[in-house]
């Protein structure tokens, strides 16, 4: 099984085949090494996306603090970001344009969401940011020094857990929308906190899949636009992780 992340699918990360046939009918693979995916290039794209996200999130936060309604940013940014994700998952060659756009609109979403949580629990945003990047660095070091190796079994377990979480969230959201059902992960009970911790663990494990696919994409010398594609997939995981940390910290804070 491959990563459930729409930006880390099998077909997108297959090695490109550029075939040249000479006059005698001999076939050879031609690759332009100046136009292929690299790890350093993906890192640079990830940093550019992070900068865009931080700038737009900061602007949204500032506007919300001065009296603007955060809901248009929250809903609009989230929906448009989701649409860009869907388009890029089917048209990865457009990632050069879609990835920066995703970072921009996701910044609107993150800025509005952060402002809402910060208003309720002062100091929670810096804690969530710190927890997110600490988790990222720990996972990166564990992957870099081969403490954690991404095997097929590892992928299967992580993907299965992630799909289960997605289905659970979708079903409970629909039930809560149209019935009086109260999902167990709502509120600040110990069980709810435990579920949040479990989801954070699964989100963190997805980082290993992201690292593995980016590394293999570079090894396979994929097209240059796959740097944006890989960076976009990594950004999705980081945003998910940050949102889950916000939720966990808010549950803990509300118990005080």
What positions do the PLM features span?
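A hydrophobic alpha-helical transmembrane-helix feature that marks the membrane cores
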Residues: 1-256
């Amino acid at each position: 099984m491959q990563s459930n992340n729409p930006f880390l699918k099998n077909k997108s990360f297959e090695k490109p085949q550029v075939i040249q046939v000479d006059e005698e009918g001999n076939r050879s693979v031609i690759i332009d090494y100046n136009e292929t995916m690299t790890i350093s290039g993906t890192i640079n794209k990830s940093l550019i996306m992070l900068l865009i996200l931080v700038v737009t999130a900061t602007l949204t936060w500032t506007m919300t603090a001065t009296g603007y309604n955060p809901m248009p940013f929250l809903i609009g940014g989230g929906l448009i970001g989701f649409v860009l994700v869907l388009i890029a998952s089917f048209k990865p060659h457009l990632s050069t344009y879609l990835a920066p756009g995703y970072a921009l609109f996701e910044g609107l979403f993150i800025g509005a969401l952060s402002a809402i949580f910060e208003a309720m629990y002062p100091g929670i945003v810096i804690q969530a940011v710190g927890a997110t990047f600490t988790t990222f660095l720990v996972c990166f070091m564990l992957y870099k020094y081969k403490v954690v190796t991404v095997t097929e079994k590892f992928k299967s377990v992580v993907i299965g857990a992630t799909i289960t979480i997605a289905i659970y969230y979708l079903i409970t959201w629909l039930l809560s929308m149209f019935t009086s059902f109260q999902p167990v992960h709502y509120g600040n009970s110990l069980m709810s906190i435990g579920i949040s911790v479990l989801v954070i663990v699964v989100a963190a494990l997805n980082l290993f899949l992201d690292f593995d696919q980016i590394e293999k994409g570079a090894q396979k010398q994929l097209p240059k636009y796959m740097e944006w594609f890989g960076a976009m997939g990594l950004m999705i995981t980081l945003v998910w992780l940050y949102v889950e940390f916000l939720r966990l910290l808010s549950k803990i804070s509300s118990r005080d």
